[in-house]
């Protein structure tokens, strides 16, 4: 890692070294964990109650539309999680960042969980709307590929006796899989799919009624905080486990 970092400027090197310090990360994670976990629980519960029990039914879909309050945030977090996984993989390859390796390993299962939730709720939503649990359209297929990319990353980083080889192989797979993200995003525009175009965009006003939009946004914030809280907790545990193993190994070598 040091050899790669020396190619950067002094200020960048100092910033990377500070962030890569396990003790500093553990202190930061311990400080932010309660501020992530408690709001995540409260906001998610509030959003789900608002969406599932208070918001109105859709005039076409009826109460089936309430699946949206779980499905849509899960779909957004599935793609966002993979983008973060790719960013950590890039940092791992370019700067040999140890925390990037551990964060990527811990993001994988969380992202896979949200992707699986997206697929499951989408299937439940699709049955009453389309008359089938599954349809091989572009959006569904690309999200399924995303799920397999997550599973492939999880398997690949654990497939080698040398952890560094596993980290490198997983990072390469993650970066190659980034090409799937724009396919997921724009599949409804590029191909004729059963999914409707995006109702919330950065360039225009949302086409969704406000009494449905607000609980959806609250659920999304809650899901994002939940994702962050789980990843921080898992990465913190991974760093602590590595430090404990290092201490035990040092004691064993000293005893010999």
Label each PLM-derived region with a short phrase.
Residues 2-256:
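Polytopic transmembrane helical bundles with strong interfacial aromatic enrichment
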